[in-house]
């Protein structure tokens, strides 16, 4: 079951490969995610020093958060992957046009995981084509319903 989805990722990118990564989170962040207070639409993934980080995701702290902790909602969060997966991703990202995008946050065994995708950006005409296909599928379904 997904906690947060990045629906815009499928519109803006051609998804090549998907990976499931663990997240290094603080306690207040897990509580906030359980309450559904997160957003990954603006997020992106970068590689620094053979480590992978999630930048730009927003997790709003709950008002009941501890008074001695000053939460930063947009802090950089480390992603946990196997070394071989990281090496493979570094090789792919260094190729022209490839990037890493967060797709969703979900639970697995009580832990919060992040699906990331190796993706290639869509051009404007690709986005228009996707929109036309989606519109045609809706029209086709509407015509089929009207015919029966």
UniProtKB/Swiss-Prot annotation:
NCBIfam families: PRK05422.1 (NF003843), smpB (TIGR00086). Disulfide bonds: none annotated. Required for rescue of stalled ribosomes mediated by trans-translation. Binds to transfer-messenger RNA (tmRNA), required for stable association of tmRNA with ribosomes. tmRNA and SmpB together mimic tRNA shape, replacing the anticodon stem-loop with SmpB. tmRNA is encoded by the ssrA gene; the 2 termini fold to resemble tRNA(Ala) and it encodes a 'tag peptide', a short internal open reading frame. During trans-translation Ala-aminoacylated tmRNA acts like a tRNA, entering the A-site of stalled ribosomes, displacing the stalled mRNA. Keywords: Cytoplasm, RNA-binding. The gene is smpB. GO terms for biological process: trans-translation. Pfam families: SmpB (PF01668). It comes from the Bacteria. One of its GO terms (cellular component) is cytosol. GO terms for molecular function: RNA binding. Belongs to the SmpB family. It is found in: Cytoplasm. This is SsrA-binding protein. PANTHER family: SSRA-BINDING PROTEIN, TMRNA-BINDING COMPONENT OF TRANS-TRANSLATION TAGGING COMPLEX. Its main location: cytoplasm.
